[in-house]
Amino acid sequence: MLIHPQFDPVALHLGPLAIRWYGLMYLAAFIMFLWFGRLRTRQPHIAAEGWTGRDLDDMLFYGVLGVILGGRLGYVLFYKPDWYFAHPLDIFKVWEGGMAFHGGFLGVVVAMMLYARMRGRSWMQVTDFIAPMVPCGLAAGRLGNFINGELWGRVSSPNLPWSMMFPQAQGEDREWLLSHAQEAVTSGLQAVFDQYHMLPRHPSQIYQFLGEGVLFFILLWLYARKPRPMGAVSGAFLLGYGVFRFAAEFAREPDNFLGLLAANLSMGQWLSLPMILIGIAMLVWSYRRAGNGEKNQAHA
């Protein structure tokens, strides 16, 4: 078993200014977007569509606005609507935390639709272009979660070699022991808690960093290197992220104020299901549309 090292959330101090690790992760995500975006503009089928570095800069600006506004509103509406409707001014306290990926995703979609309209492009053409770079941002975000010691995983077996104890989760650990008293004794978890005053948990932030971040980036980047029908790369992103996130949620601790919902699924899983279905539908539509186009050309 491992113990979370409890990193200082502040990476460095510049006079009165505190630079936090999580902020640096956002910066890393933006830099990787520009770096891999420029590599993508050099791919022949992408260059043929006229993408330039200027487009990347503009899309990053709109994307940042979409992530921040959508992520915050998504958290407010999906996770704690009762609280924020009763305390509306707290919506603006973003420094206290509270961002939702699914909300940020919708925010980016809206931002890219506006950008596409301004540039006279199809919004699917825009989302197909940016989709392969998005997992880089996901990886950076999950690494930031791990450094902050937040969004930890569910209680795991003490025999799991990479299980990790999170000092910040001690309150949730006690709640788990109260509701699983018999299981805690038979599994040896009570003995672990008696010794360390913490319970071993899945380091789900690392699972998500490796899954929906690193592995998903590699797979989607390789898929998008070749010309694909319009909408296919966007559909592959929705399907892939939805599957990775749905699977990771089985190891991630549900939000304390929500718990598990219908069918013992978490909010993250319920929000991922539509992404999976829409992703499949987009892939089917995309390839059928491309196939029909080839048939029409053959009969012309």
Curated annotation (Swiss-Prot):
It comes from the Bacteria. It is an enzyme of class 2 (transferase). The chain crosses the membrane at residues 17-37, 59-79, 94-114, 129-149, 204-224, 230-250, 265-285. Its EC number is 2.5.1.145. It is a multi-pass membrane protein. It holds the Pfam family LGT. Pathway: Protein modification; lipoprotein biosynthesis (diacylglyceryl transfer). One of its GO terms (biological process) is lipoprotein biosynthetic process. Belongs to the Lgt family. NCBIfam families: lgt (TIGR00544). This is Phosphatidylglycerol--prolipoprotein diacylglyceryl transferase. The gene is lgt.
